[in-house]
Amino acid sequence: VAQNGAGDLGIYLQITRGVVEKRQHAFPEHPLPTVFAYAFDISPPSDGSPETASCFRAVTRRDQRWGRCHIKSTALLGNVLHIMEAVEEEAEEVLLFNEQNELTEAAACNVFVVRGDKILTPELDHQKLPGVTRRQCLELLEAHTDWSVEVRPVSRDEVLSASEIWLSSS
């Protein structure tokens, strides 16, 4: 961080199992992990007021990603294809829905839906990555607010009629 000028920086860290001399799908016995990291500028945190909140345009799509989204991996082709569809429609994010028309997540974020005095967020399962920031938001909402938080399936109709939608991501 100091070498990159300190200040408001994000750090991307990726550690893989490593490489093998000959391509194979089985895990190697004694791999040497590959470690990759870099720092990048981020905006300072907002004060949380409506005047400084960031607004984004999002589109909705049927979730076409693979069925193991709860696994953190670099296999992001499905997410990338969804984002590219959003960009083609001049949107910054895409809200994804499963075959039952229930919200899964966004292509790069977890989702919170505000309806009346309730905050809804989908329950975790194989279709959703359990985000660190999502968990922290839930803990803070429970400890420091009077908001009613419901972790449960969230329908497309509930999303489309929401008064607010929050996205959380590290």
Regions found by a protein language model. Give the residues of each.
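Helix-start/capping segments and mature chain N-termini
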Residues: 3, 21-170
